[in-house]
């Protein structure tokens, strides 16, 4: 299995530990950055990873930031990505079984033993292929296909203070 992984500066230590852990389990791991604890903005890394998942260059992705929230929001802007911010093994199981999530977002402050358990459950749980879940995913895909474009005409967010 091929896994993409990315983080911001706060998720970097956890990302590095996960790379070692996954490599020992014989996963092929592609690191999309960042490469240090120097402060960075997570969207750049989330978008790169999301594109690799959406384009089927990898089977799954893992993103890590301080809370897992911001980087998951950024990942979910990539068409075809279903990124779930997960805090426990039950959520890891359900997001795969019910939502067919293809990217796992983690809190960089979470204990490593918990992170490893969550990752193991996420990768070892299959989508259930139940009609109601398939229908929900298809509704999301249809919305993406009809409403999400590569470039938006929105004004850039600015802080004029």
Identify the role of each PLM range.
Residues 4-24:
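Glycine-rich phosphate/diphosphate-binding loop of Rossmann-like nucleotide-binding domains
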Residues 6, 32, 64-65, 86, ...:
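Structural motif
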Residues 16-19, 73-77, 117:
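Short amphipathic alpha-helical segments
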Residues 45, 49-85:
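Helix-adjacent hinge/juxtasegments
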């Amino acid at each position: 299995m091929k896994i993409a992984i990315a983080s911001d500066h706060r998720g970097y230590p956890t990302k590095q530990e996960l790379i070692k852990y996954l490599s020992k389990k014989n996963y092929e791991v592609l690191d999309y950055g960042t490469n240090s604890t120097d402060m960075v903005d997570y969207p750049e890394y989330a978008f790169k990873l999301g594109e690799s998942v959406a384009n089927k260059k990898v089977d799954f992705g893992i993103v890590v930031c301080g809370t897992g929230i911001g980087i998951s929001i950024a990942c979910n802007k990539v068409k075809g990505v279903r990124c779930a911010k997960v805090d426990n093994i039950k959520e890891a199981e359900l997001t795969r079984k019910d939502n067919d999530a293809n990217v796992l977002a983690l809190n960089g402050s979470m204990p490593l033993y918990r992170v490893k358990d969550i990752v193991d459950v996420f990768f070892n749980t299959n989508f259930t292929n139940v009609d109601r879940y398939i229908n929900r995913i298809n509704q999301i895909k249809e919305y993406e296909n009809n409403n999400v474009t590569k470039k938006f005409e929105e004004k850039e967010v600015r802080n004029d203070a």
